Amino acid sequence: MNEPQFLYLTTLGWKTGKKHRIEIWYVKRNRNYYVISEVGASAHWVRNICHNPNISFSVNGLNFVGLARIVNPMKETRLAAEVSELMKVKYKWDQGLIVELKSLDFDERQLRS
């Protein structure tokens, strides 16, 4: 497996406004990246996203600016199942709240190439 184990996600603290950076397992599906909060919505970084979905993240030396959102497994059953399966294959684990990270740079970069 050539893919890195972690990505680095930066959110803005909803109380402090300060940058909060974490190292977290991830998978990529199509153009988006997905991470899972083991403790659900109580994780500080998830709370930050709920208050302000603007994020930045880096993976494998590439930096992105984007938006994050919580995946609703009841309404997005196929997406949730596919992300869970990708996490199981990569990490042998898939339990928790799925969060989608969408790069706002992707389409612009593709047009330039």
Task: Give the label of every model feature segment.
Residues 4-38, 55:
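Short beta-strand segments
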Residues 40-112:
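Short, structured beta-strand-loop surface elements
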